[in-house]
Amino acid sequence: MTRLASRFGAANLIRRDRPLTREELFRVVPSVFSEDKHESRSERYTYIPTISLLDSLQREGFQPFFACQTRVRDPRRREHTKHMLRLRREGQITGKQVPEIILLNSHDGTSSYQMLPGMFRAVCQNGLVCGESFGEVRVPHKGDVVSQVIEGAYEVLGIFERVEEKRDAMQSLLLPPPVQQALAKAALTYRFGEDHQPVTESQILSPRRWQDESNDLWTTYQRIQENLIKGGLSGRNAKGGRTHTRAVRGIDGDVKLNRALWVMAETLLTQLQ
């Protein structure tokens, strides 16, 4: 699996059911407004503040509703650290299942601009990251960055029709219990490793609300994703002691797990169709 350039740990974040204001962004993700590249960057580094790109994207009708940046110990890096914005088309911010553009960036040389296709599911407040088969857009810090990022945003938008086709196909495919268990086992192994999984397949297949009781592939995938991302499930550690699974709070870990689960669901769809 391709590794994202981002390595978010615990992050400052903000989410609203409307476009975020400049004041909200500045308070929570100051690196979006950074006025200069980090001192470690060379002369060839093309510096474009993320806020300038956001201004251009907003003129094209994309609005941020979620933003976060990595917490750093060195205050000198706070204005340049990695950050992530999730953008939607104006008028779609409060939809039930909404396509998103996920924009990742930093100004300390740790990542290029990256844009990924995503989907937000309102019923569980989870953001999905669609798998590698749909690709991603990377824009290095050189040349005409603004035009490339805007072009990339439309390229990501063009992917969503295929994403929705996959979603519809997953919704139409019912999974017998043994297949659900196999998918859950693969997800547990990815999340916790092969040696020990603190919870069972049945636990991560358990729905948290009545809307998720269906046994189609799409809903089964949603249940697994939410239970692994949100954590809080009671289980046993490797020594047999009581434990609870932790939520996935690091943004990079969230993105990687999300993408892995999508690939698993997509692979299963291909095998069973």
Curated annotation (Swiss-Prot):
It comes from the Bacteria. InterPro entries: DUF932. Belongs to the UPF0380 family. This is UPF0380 protein YfjQ. The gene is yfjQ.
